[in-house]
Design a protein with these regions (language model features):
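An acidic, low-aromatic, low-complexity terminal/linker signal
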Residues: 1-166
Length: 166
């Protein structure tokens, strides 16, 4: 079989890689609208616990979520200097996700992705993990960004942003 046929057998996926604490995660680049430095976050009283606050991104108010909190990871008192906000679109709503670092954007082949390991017992966790990419010694957890937040949580985040924008 010629090499060109082998190459076309597996689709390449472009991923935005980010870190939360000691873990590496990836999301398909098509879900990412932009990556921004952490802007001044306005904390909103009585906002749902998963919402860190809102930011003004070039005139548009976006709800920002602490992804570490959403995943039940240890929260830091201060964000690292490398922290970024990944702006995504979920259920037709733009949201910001605070992550510790966005070191790279990579291309991988679908054949490098393995199903979610059985060791992950929680159905909630399995619900938003698409699989695991093995890149040498690195394991990158691939997220299904549409399932990280429920539709109800996305609606709540959109309401918070609209109240502030009004």
């Amino acid at each position: 079989m010629p090499k060109t046929e082998l190459k076309s057998k597996f689709r390449e996926i472009q991923l935005v890689i980010f870190r939360l604490r000691d873990e590496e995660f990836g999301v398909e680049i098509g879900s990412v609208l932009e990556i921004s430095r952490v802007l001044d976050i306005t904390h909103i009283p009585e906002a749902p616990g998963f919402i860190e606050g809102v930011i003004n991104l070039r005139g548009k108010v976006l709800a920002v979520l602490a992804l570490a909190r959403q995943f039940g990871l240890q929260e830091e008192k201060e964000l690292p200097k490398t922290a970024r906000i990944i702006v995504i679109e979920v259920h037709n709503t733009s949201l910001g996700l605070i992550v510790d670092e966005v070191p790279e954007v990579i291309k991988i082949s679908e054949e490098e992705i393995e199903p979610t390991p059985e060791i992950i017992q929680s159905e909630v966790n399995r619900h938003y993990i698409k699989g695991v990419a093995k890149l040498g010694a690195r394991l990158i957890i691939l997220l299904d960004i549409n399932n990280v937040l429920s539709f109800h949580e996305v609606e709540e985040a959109a309401k918070v942003a609209k109240v502030v924008e009004a």
